[in-house]
Amino acid sequence: MILEHIGLSQINGRLVVLDGVKGVQYDERAELHLDDGSTRVGRVVRVDGDRCVIQVFEGTRGLSLVNNRTVLTGHPMMMDVSPELLGRVLDGLGRPIDGLGDIYPVARRDVNGAPINPVSRVYPRNYIHTGISSIDCLATLIRGQKLPIFSGSGMKHNELAVQIVRQASVADGSDFAIVFAAMGVKNDVASYFRESFESCGAMERVVMLLNLANDPIIERIITPRAALTVAEYLAFDLNKNVLVILTDMTSYCEALREFSSSKGEIPGRKGFPGYLYSDLASLYERAGIIKGSKGSVTQIPILTMPGDDITHPIPDLTGYITEGQIVLDRGMDATGLYPPVSVLPSLSRLMKDGIGAGYTREDHVTLSNQLFACYAKVQDAKALASVIGEEELSQSDKQLMAFGRAFEQEFIGQGNTDRTMEQTLDLGWELLATLPRNALDRCDAATLDKYYEPAKARISKANNK
């Protein structure tokens, strides 16, 4: 039911208060019509009897307590969706800002989405190729998964996001699209994202939503919801496999904290609202696959850990909800290694069911386990070398140290190279081939005969040239 109200009871910052209104719903969309003919959009953030509080996205400057006309639309924030969204740049509310004209919608969807019946969910299988060895081999991204990237301020997570957008694909060649939402970014970062996508030719399969640092915080809270609404339309209406990249979730959570404080809510840990967990879950749980649909929604939320603290509420709660994490290492980043993925704390909890024979290659699981095991031993050898010096290490530990350096420089630090899964797995075996066969205790004899020995032969042949 549409309601109209003349005048405002109070104006407080970005909040306006209406008295004497009935039938208003929480989260309802409001339109405020000013004397000069302009219209501002707001959202009902509190209802108390016949009083409601509206947060105005564009701010309250110029509003009048007497003559302002407020229209309560009777529905929540909606998003216009259409196949024409692909290749377009939108603001945080889903409105075009690329100068290419309006989008003619084929449907309007609630940005809050609809809850997915757990019974109708399909268990995620099949992987999404990123072209990044440390992810594809050791923390494989599975369709329908939510796999966050834990980064730190000043690290190269923006470059990594661009590389994933440029290289991401699905192995079976089915329709693939990317929804990229940037929240609270500076103008130069927004320009970097846009120019990077356009220069590499990826823009035609990308829907881009930009919420800048000087945009309203309430818009920042809507942005990931608008992005996921677009993704759900592309996936479940158009049967596309959709990858959603949300950066930076820390900006989103800080906007939520500021918004909660403005409403006078009791703060929780580090000032964040007590409902931070359920709010993040309402976003992350929109990933998945539904029975009867050929599409999927996969999420990569990117967040910068305040003070590089993985126990901070934002990464801590994100880790509870999602299915693994990719952790970027500041020490690696300082040495110029890119991408600076710290493989030992990184994991993908769903990769075991989406790799191996029929998905990637039969040796993938074994190779991944062996690389993890050997690199963990490298850390032990490094710790010992820091005490007694590398020259005093045993021969086996020296071999491990050499393997560790090669693994970091060649396997992890691949730069902007796009590697196929085959190239990644072959490189993994070539690195393991620098170690003696009896050191590979996670591999069976048949796998070693098929992959380790040919890799060792290739290395010997290359060294003899």
Protein language model regions, located:
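A generic structural motif
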Residues: 13, 37-39, 49, 106, ...
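Active-site phosphate-binding and catalytic loops of NTP-dependent enzymes
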Residues: 38-42, 77-81, 95-102, 119-125, ...
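Glycine-rich, histidine-containing beta strand-loop boundary motifs that form or position
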Residues: 20, 56, 93, 101, ...
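P-loop NTPase catalytic core
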Residues: 137-464
